[in-house]
Structure formats: structure tokens, C-alpha cells
Amino acid sequence: MRAFTTWLCILTWAPFLSIQAALPNPFEISETEDQIKIAGSALEAVVRKKGYVTGVFGGTFLDKKTGFRDAGYGLDIVDWIMEPGSDEAYRDQLPGDLPYQFNNLYHGTTPKRSIEGPQICTKAKELAPRVIRGPDFAAVTMSYRYHLAAPGKKTGSEWNQIMVFPAGRRYFISSDRITAVNASDAMFLRLDMPGHIKHKRGDTFSQVYLSYAGRIPPSEFLQDFAPEQKFNYRRGVNPTPQRFIRAYRLRDPKTGGDGPWLAGMTLEPAVVYEAWCHQRGYVCMIEEFGGRPIQPGQSFRAAFIVGFFDSIEEMEKVYDQHAGHTGLEVNERGWRLVK
């Protein structure tokens, strides 16, 4: 009992946690062969097992306060393990979806290459997410081992994702972690944070907010442009912001009325290697974290808060309560953010 009590005392966000394990879980969780649905008093979310996987499935993240949903393909959606440099010398030898074309509007002019793949969200096809029910939260964990690799690289690096949904909150906390089987001078993981924005000439959002670039109107996203052309963040090129927040203000495409902000907040700004916010048929919100030297057997990770907020000030308040964390741990007794 002493060990259990001590463990709970050091949990981050202690007000949301309870030792009253006998109380019923405040979430309704339904599960089929294809998906898991989590429904609480503040939000709903679907996690797919098959098809387009990882994170929260697009269009299913519901804010019960306002009735708005996310406007994209999903939240905290995961791609390849990558590094700087070109694959042109061996591109014809790369299996599957590992070739990385650049010098285009999709990927810009910065040479990058895949170390391992495939892109999990589109190519894994099926994952085995596990539900954890706590006294006042629900959580989902999942993992995947990459099975494609560039010439001279091994397969088998492991990706792990944890998502925790605290009762009564309009957001979830997540963490993505890579345990590497390859060495690299600057390995990074590519994901969508919070997620891309589907729109027709800005009809689904009224603003984008980037903590490193400020407020941006929809008129900036009417024509396609390359990632580095506008609103790009690159560690070592741009100053590291105090908070790393990327958000968009939802808008009802039928009425034009504003809804809540949907934000993705990386709790330790220093882990972000590069972050895009560019138009390519939709607003692409790719984020890459890591980008530092790594050896086989080592790991790197990032932690996020993703969800609905009424104002930028509210985002900042929540961010500041949890800033500096890079990981997340969970079991049936509780959860905690870790540094």
C-alpha cells in the first residue's frame, strides 16, 4: 500500500486521479473488430484497429460542449522513421513506400530520407490497440515494429503510442516513442500534430495559430505552397518558442460560425526537429521530433496534449501546468507524464 500511495503522489495532474478504484469508470467504451470508441462527458473519440490507423481517427473527435469535431484525417497520426539526407543514390533499391521525393510542393526542397517504414497510418493496415480503464480515465496503448528498411539499415525499430483521456476534460494526453535498432546522426519520427485540416477555401477554420508564428487567416491557404515557403519551424533556424502550440479555430462550413480551437501541444519544445504548416490540397500539419544522434537500443520520445479549447489563453494555461514532459506512463491505477 505504501508503494502504491507513493506512486500516486508523484503522478502528474494529481487532481484528476483517484484512489477510489471501486468507482465505475466514467467512460463508455465499445469495441468491435475494427475500432474502439471512447465516450465520456466531455468528448468522444474513435481509435481504429484496421485501415487508417494510429492516433484518433479523423472526424470522430467530438467536443460535447460545442458539437464540433476535428476537421481532418486524424490526430497524432504516425508515419516513417527518417533522417536528413537524400536517398537519390539508392532510391531504385528502396522497398515499398520508402522512396522520398523532394524538390516539390509536397515535401519542399529539404533532402530527407526514410530509415524504416512503412508509413504506419496507411500501410500497417492493422494494429492491436489495448484499452486500459482507470478510476477516472481511459487509455489506449498500441505498438508497431517497422519491417522495411533502407539499404544497410536493419528492420525492427518499435513505435509505441499511449493516449490517456482524463474524465471531464476536452483533451487527451499522448506520447509517441521510438526504440531504435539503427544508428543515426539525426533520427526523427514524422507524425501529424494535431492533424491536417480538410477545407474548401478555408470553410472549416477561421484561423490557424502557431506559437512560433502567431495567428494566420485562411486566406494564406488558398493556393498550394511548399513547406519551407511559409510558416515553417526548424530547430536551429528558428528560435525555440516558450510553448510549442499548433492549433486551428474550427468553423461551421454551413453557417460560418466559429467553434472551439483544436490544438496540438508538444510539451517540450526542444524535442521538435521541424514542423510544417503548408497548403497541399489541405493544410498539412506534419511535425517531426527527435533529430539528434542515436545508437541501436536507445529511444526518443515526445508528449502532447491534443484537444479543444475556448481560447489561446486557455491553451497556454494548460500547457504551462505540464510543460517540460516528454513521456507518458499508464496502468490501471493511474497515469503520469514523465521527463
Roles of regions detected by a PLM:
Residues 33-147:
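Acidic-aromatic substrate-binding/catalytic surfaces of carbohydrate-active enzymes
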Residues 42-49, 157-165, 259-266:
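Broad, structure-driven detector of short, well-ordered beta-strand segments within folded domains
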Residues 24, 34, 183-257:
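Polysaccharide-binding surfaces and accessory modules of carbohydrate-active proteins
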Residues 1-3:
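N-terminal secretory signal peptides that target proteins for export/translocation
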Residues 6-18:
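Bacterial N-terminal signal peptides
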Residues 30, 49, 129-201:
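Acidic, contiguous internal or C-terminal segments within carbohydrate-active enzymes
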Residues 27-39, 229-339:
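Beta-strand-rich recognition/accessory modules
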Residues 89, 115-117, 124-134, 147, ...:
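Catalytic cores of extracellular degradative/oxidative enzymes
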